[in-house]
């Protein structure tokens, strides 16, 4: 089970986008990386295709998961732990002790 999943609200802990928050849109567990909407934007040169025209486009680059943390209810970053509730393994916020997913 992953500590950070698609759809989680996260905050960036280090780097040029430190302090910015966003939603995880993709997780790459084999590379330990995640893509966050609107964070770590890079410019890519797009070759012309039938569907798209040529030009420079902005897109999100991936971040290492050690550089992001889930946002707790109070808006501060929290670590993630695991607990068994009703025979089911769930993620728990270390800061508040609340279950992250039902």
From Swiss-Prot:
Description of how the protein assembles with itself and partners: Part of the 50S ribosomal subunit.
Cysteine-cysteine disulfides: none
Keyword check for Signal: no
GO MF annotations in UniProt: rRNA binding; structural constituent of ribosome
Organism field: Agrobacterium fabrum (strain C58 / ATCC 33970)
Keywords: Ribonucleoprotein, Ribosomal protein, RNA-binding, rRNA-binding
Gene Ontology biological process terms from the UniProt entry: translation
Domain of life: Bacteria
Family matches, as InterPro entries: KOW, Rib_uL2_dom2, Ribosomal_uL24, Ribosomal_uL24_CS, Ribosomal_uL24_KOW, Translation_prot_SH3-like_sf
Record protein name field: Large ribosomal subunit protein uL24
Gene designation per UniProt: rplX
A cellular component annotation (GO) from this entry: ribonucleoprotein complex
Family from the record: Belongs to the universal ribosomal protein uL24 family.
Function: One of two assembly initiator proteins, it binds directly to the 5'-end of the 23S rRNA, where it nucleates assembly of the 50S subunit.
């Amino acid at each position: 089970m992953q500590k950070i999943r698609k759809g989680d609200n996260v905050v960036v802990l280090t780097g040029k986008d430190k302090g910015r928050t966003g939603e995880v849109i993709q997780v790459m567990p084999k590379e330990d990386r995640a893509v966050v909407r609107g964070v770590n934007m890079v410019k890519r040169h797009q070759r012309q295709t039938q569907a798209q025209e040529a030009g420079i486009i902005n897109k999100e680059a991936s971040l290492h998961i050690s550089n992001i943390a889930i946002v707790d209810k109070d808006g501060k970053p929290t670590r993630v732990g695991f607990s068994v509730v009703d025979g089911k393994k769930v993620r728990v916020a270390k800061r508040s002790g609340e279950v992250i997913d039902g």
